[in-house]
């Protein structure tokens, strides 16, 4: 399970998930990527389940990069506890994902194999996702520069 080694504060505010992803919205390592279409908190267990689903399908052929990390602790109070008495203890860790964020990257396999591996990973995640390729992003980048 992914989690920070050391944190400055054990408990953080929940925050808002407004707007699009400005960082991490392009493919930087691999040839294919899995892009988020909705905002969500992705838990470390969900990230690990998606990673295992992809690596089991591609076997030893390709390489997988995880481009999100769960930095945010989510607290929870024990069951049947009265209100008050402070905030609960940290229960699990989440990564805040906005629309347009590339969460996973993959290379070293064919496109149809990568597409199927990403489809298996999508089923492990609580949001709608989109399969993207490096060529698609280069074409979009070229069109933007011409205008």
From Swiss-Prot:
Positions of transmembrane segments: none
Short name of one Pfam family: Ribosomal_L16
Keyword rRNA-binding: yes
Example of a GO MF term: rRNA binding
Keywords assigned: Ribonucleoprotein, Ribosomal protein, RNA-binding, rRNA-binding, tRNA-binding
A GO cellular component entry from the record: cytosolic large ribosomal subunit
GO biological process, one term: translation
Chain intervals for the UniProt region annotation (Disordered): 1-20
Disulfide bonds: none
PANTHER family from the UniProt entry: 50S/60S RIBOSOMAL PROTEIN L16, LARGE RIBOSOMAL SUBUNIT PROTEIN UL16M
Known function: Binds 23S rRNA and is also seen to make contacts with the A and possibly P site tRNAs.
Subunit comment: Part of the 50S ribosomal subunit.
Family according to the record: Belongs to the universal ribosomal protein uL16 family.
Name listed for the protein in its UniProt record: Large ribosomal subunit protein uL16
Phylogenetic lineage: Bacteria, Bacillati, Bacillota, Clostridia, Peptostreptococcales
């Amino acid at each position: 399970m992914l989690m920070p080694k050391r944190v400055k504060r054990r408990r953080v505010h929940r925050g808002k998930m407004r707007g699009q992803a400005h960082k991490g919205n392009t493919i930087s390592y691999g040839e294919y990527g899995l892009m988020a279409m909705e905002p969500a908190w992705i838990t470390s267990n969900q990230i690990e389940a998606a990673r295992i689903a992809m690596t089991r399908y591609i076997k030893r052929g390709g390489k997988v990069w995880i481009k999100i990390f769960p930095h945010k602790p989510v607290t929870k109070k024990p069951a049947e506890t009265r209100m008050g008495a402070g905030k609960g203890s940290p229960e699990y860790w989440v990564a805040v994902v906005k629309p347009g964020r590339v969460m996973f990257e993959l290379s070293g396999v064919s496109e149809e194999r990568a597409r199927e591996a990403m489809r298996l990973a999508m089923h492990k995640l609580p949001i709608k996702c989109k399969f993207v390729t490096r060529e698609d992003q280069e074409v979009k980048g070229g069109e933007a520069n011409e205008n």
